[in-house]
Curated annotation (Swiss-Prot):
It is a lipid-anchor; GPI-anchor. GO terms for biological process: adhesion of symbiont to host; cell adhesion; filamentous growth; single-species biofilm formation on inanimate substrate. Keywords: Cell adhesion, Cell wall, Glycoprotein, GPI-anchor, Lipoprotein, Membrane, Secreted, Signal, Virulence. GPI-anchored cell wall protein required for mating efficiency, biofilm formation, adhesion, filamentous growth, and oxidative stress tolerance. Involved in normal disseminated infection in a mouse systemic candidiasis model. GO terms for cellular component: extracellular region; hyphal cell wall; side of membrane. This is Hyphal wall protein 2. The keyword DNA damage does not apply. It comes from the Eukaryota. Residues 406-416, 624-638 have a biased composition (Polar residues). The lineage of its organism: Eukaryota, Fungi, Dikarya, Ascomycota, Saccharomycotina. It comes from Candida albicans (strain SC5314 / ATCC MYA-2876) (Yeast).
Length: 908
């Protein structure tokens, strides 16, 4: 008995000690057990009950917030657990600044996604010339306005970004022009990408890294918007509504480029506008593509003295100093310098274009062709028009493919009758990128019937590998002299061997592996309109004081017969399967003086392409030169793009002039020169510009389970003109490898307008779907041709470019170049998912940008997990039994010890 009493006393002491040290929580009571399984429950903003599979979840359920306060942890006593995402509203405040006046616009967009992993992208860019985006179309904006960028992104799990792209656009304007846009797009998986730019601001570097975070950590997308105007910048960090319940975090930083205003000085001192554009060379395990667009300058001078226009151009590699300018060109850094001097004695225009080289692994293929011409024509009390045209094609490499393809030969010979007062010299240099620059100056009525044409041919092989070699140039001299009363021209012919270039790269967007063309460069040089579009989309509308011309998808030529200069040029590079496209532009000068520029881009299977363009003038002073252009193409080249084209076959373009009106459908191509019998028996096939790339698509298509549509109305206003564009975007994807980025930088500018001209360019709409996937099946085939409307009497232009690269990546960049000239700019652009309506405003109103967002409700399926937890029957009777107290059993320590002591005493 004594032994039993001792044992009971010992047990009582042990229990009391254990109770003091480790409270018997929940052991002797029926209170619910607090179970933390690490599952997140993100509720809607309201406190309504959520009913899931017959269970009602009371809003009184105990929640515990994790460290980043991004989601709520549901702690119940067992049974059913829910993993879902709450519908969030993202409010992005866009700050627009113009003339030191800023306005803020709020954008609210809901974005939800449930994925497994996401990547962290940390992008750092200079705020002056670089905009870092993901899958974003772009266009140069040389007006003195602010740009606003709104990025809404959904970043799903384990998304591999298989494309690294760099696109640079530089556009210059005769007055109030200092701006440049350089867009660097980097998509990557687990590699480091470094971008270097040799520009006036500090070099920029883009690094991407993947940082592992704790599992089940919800992430938010933070967008930093930077709006700059007149050297004043404002930044705002916005947390977007892309809540992803994953183990990684996504952070984006977007910069809109800085725009500046410079006042033109009409004196003997030149107003210099410097345009700096950097070239980003990205090394990545995927495809790289670099595209460069250089736009030229147009100057008009009214003078009673002799006007001399000098145009010099130099293309070189590895930092060769240019002639007549201080710019240097290299394969990694490009600086364009534009200077214009206006006085009562004449006009001097300088222009330099840049070349960009894209480098990947062991593949590097580049070539260059640049021509320079100088001409001076005496003028007596007449208008002098300076015309510059440049077409820049950037080589793009695909993976580590390499092959040897015969190089095409370009032969350029021009023979012009002599005159005692005019001297024209043509020179050529070579650089690392195929760049063709043509300049001409024609003035007054003293130029009798002068015609000049030049042509450039570029070949693109259709093979899995490409390797180019640049052969040495053999200059040829051909000159013919015809007695003329007022003109003496010298002509030099130079023959260049231009290598073949592989111009396609593979990218993955929303599960689609398509062929993406990055070097679609469209340059129109009668109104300084530059339009760079992606995915086989190229459109430019040129308008001068008496003529308006439009080229959107085909190689159509529009020529006015008035005394002003009109020019168009389109460069179309089709899919690398024996598809040829041509582009040409013509300029009609006073007194039937014509300057024609023709560019032919051909993709042969194996044999080289030889394009010869010869121009000769009969020995009569008043006769018009006959021009002939022969295009030799491989017999295996077929016009196969028309059958698969759905984006621009119905596009119509109209040309409005003061006395001449011409309307040419986009699907019809015309050449300003006479096409003679080529050396080969292959016909001169004309193809449409927009070609479906679905035949080159590869990879699998992932099905999206839900899609939310966000309609953003971008309103761009400039003095007397407002343009509204509705863009449908916002795809909520619940998959495993899709990333969606959307960035907007709407443009505002100033333009003094009158009722001189009106343009209306309509782009056709096309939509294609694959199965039940609510996205575009072929990005290339369904991308509408974007019409770029530009209006100027040579100095000003307004360009609007809209590119829809995919269903989930939609970019709208409105571009306007303005100058105080008497023209009327009313562009109306329409493409897939966009509507543009011109709105008249005050002639003195301050430029402003308004972004409106209409968002449909986003519905995301919930993931239900059933987890078995051993609990008492009382706890299983109701989920609402969970409360915030720990149970009465924790307060029974003293009473339990008293009972044990009493039992021991009773035993004694």
């Amino acid at each position: 008995m004594r032994f039993a009493t001792t044992q009971l006393a010992t047990l009582a002491c042990f229990i009391l000690t254990a109770e003091a040290t480790f409270p018997l929580r929940g052991l002797f009571n029926d209170a619910p057990v607090d179970v933390d399984l690490g599952v997140y429950h993100e509720e809607s903003g309201n406190n309504k009950e959520q009913k899931v599979d017959g269970f009602n979840m009371s809003p009184n359920i105990k929640k515990r917030t994790n460290e980043n306060n991004a989601a709520n942890v549901v702690s119940t006593n067992g049974g059913l657990f829910i993993t879902s995402t709450k519908e969030l509203k993202t409010t992005v405040v866009v700050t627009s600044c113009f003339n030191n006046v800023c306005s803020e616009t709020s954008i609210t967009t809901p974005k939800t996604a449930v994925t497994a992993t996401t990547s962290k992208h940390s992008t750092s860019k200079p705020t002056y010339t670089t905009t870092s985006k993901h899958s974003t179309s772009h266009s140069s904006t040389p007006a003195s306005t602010s740009k606003h960028s709104t990025s809404t992104s959904t970043h799903p799990a384990t998304s591999e970004h298989s494309t690294s792209k760099s696109t640079h656009a530089t556009s210059s304007k005769h007055s109030t022009s200092k701006s440049s846009v350089s867009v660097t797009t980097s998509k990557h998986s687990t590699h480091d990408t470094t971008s270097k730019s040799f520009v006036t601001p500090p070099a920029s570097s883009t690094t991407s890294e993947h940082t592992k975070h704790k599992s089940h950590k919800p992430s938010k997308t933070v967008v930093t918007l930077t709006s700059c105007s007149n050297n004043a910048c404002s930044q705002s960090e916005i947390t977007t509504g892309a809540i992803v319940v994953t183990d990684k975090e996504t952070v984006y930083t977007t910069y809109c480029p800085l725009t500046d205003t410079e006042t033109e000085t009409e004196s003997t001192t030149a107003t210099t506008s410097k345009h700096s554009t950097h070239t980003t060379t990205s090394k990545h395990s995927s495809v790289e593509s670099t595209s460069v667009t250089s736009s030229s300058k147009h100057s008009v001078s009214k003078s009673t003295d002799v006007t001399t226009s000098k145009h010099s151009s130099s293309e070189s590699s590895h930092a060769t100093t240019m002639k007549h300018s201080t710019s240097k060109h290299s394969t990694h850094a490009t600086t364009s310098k534009h200077s214009t001097t206006e006085s009562t004695s004449g006009i001097t225009s300088k222009h330099s274009t840049h070349a960009t080289s894209s480098k990947y692994s062991t593949v590097e293929s580049s070539s260059s062709f640049a021509s320079t011409s100088e001409s001076s024509v005496p003028v007596s009390s007449s208008k002098s028009t300076t015309f510059e045209s440049s077409i820049s094609t950037t080589t793009s490499k695909h993976l580590t493919l390499k092959s040897s393809t015969p190089a095409s030969t370009l032969e350029y010979s021009t023979s012009i009758p002599p005159a005692p007062a005019t001297t024209s010299n043509s020179l050529s240099t070579k650089s690392t990128t195929l760049t063709t620059i043509s300049r001409s100056s024609t003035s007054g009525s003293s130029v009798p019937n002068t015609t000049r044409e030049s042509s450039t041919s570029t070949t693109t092989p259709n093979s899995s590998s490409s390797e180019s070699k640049v052969s040495s140039a053999i200059p040829k001299y051909s000159s013919s002299e015809v007695s003329s009363s007022a003109t003496t021209l010298k002509s030099y012919s130079t023959t260049h061997s231009i290598p073949t270039t592989l111009v396609y790269s593979s990218s993955t967007s929303l599960g689609f592996s398509v062929t993406e063309f990055r070097n679609l460069t469209t340059t129109s040089k009668s109104s300084l309109s530059t339009s760079t579009t992606e995915l086989l989309t190229s459109g430019t509308t040129v308008r001068s004081s008496t003529s308006e011309s439009s080229v959107t998808s085909a190689t159509s030529i529009y020529t006015s017969s008035e005394s002003t200069t009109s020019s168009e040029s389109t460069t179309s590079i089709e899919t690398p399967k024996s598809i040829a496209s041509k582009s040409s532009s013509s300029v009609t000068l006073p007194k039937s003086s014509t300057f024609a520029w023709s560019t032919s881009t051909t993709t042969p299977e194996s044999s080289p392409i030889t394009l010869k363009l010869s121009t000769s003038k009969p020995p009569k002073p008043s006769a018009t030169m006959e021009s002939s252009a022969s295009t030799t193409k491989n017999s295996s080249i077929q016009s196969t793009s028309e059958a698969t084209t759905s984006g621009s076959s119905g596009v119509e373009s109209s040309v409005l002039t003061a006395t001449t009106k011409s309307s040419v459908p986009v699907t019809t191509s015309e050449w300003s020169s006479v096409v003679t019998t080529p050396k080969s028996s292959a016909p001169n096939t004309t193809l449409e510009h927009s070609t479906s790339a679905s035949e080159t698509s590869s990879g699998s298509v992932y099905t999206t389970f839900d899609q939310s549509t966000t309609v953003i109305t971008v309103t761009s206003c400039s003095d007397n003109l407002c343009s509204k564009t509705e863009v449908t975007t916002g795809v909520t994807v619940i998959t495993s490898d899709t990333t969606s980025y959307t960035t907007y930088c709407p443009l505002t500018g100033t333009t003094t307008v009158s009722s001189a001209l009106e343009s209306l360019v309509t782009a056709n709409k096309s939509t294609s779907y694959v199965g039940a996937t609510p996205i575009v099946s072929s990005v290339v085939s369904t991308t509408p041709i974007i019409s770029s409307a530009s209006t100027t009497p040579i100095i000003s232009s307004a360009s609007t470019t809209s590119v829809i690269s995919s269903a989930s990546t939609t970019s709208v960049i409105s571009n306007a170049i303005s100058n105080p000239v008497s023209t009327d700019v009313k562009p109306t652009t329409s493409s897939q998912g966009t509507k543009s309506t011109p709105v008249d405003t005050d002639s003195k109103s301050t430029s402003e940008t308004t972004v409106m967002v209409y968002t449909t409700k986003s519905v995301t399926p919930t993931t239900v997990e059933s987890i078995s937890v051993a609990v008492s029957s009382a706890a299983q009777s109701s989920i609402a039994a969970i409360s915030s107290y720990e149970g009465t059993g924790n307060n029974m320590k003293l009473s339990f010890g008293v009972v044990i002591a009493g039992v021991a005493a009773f035993a004694i």
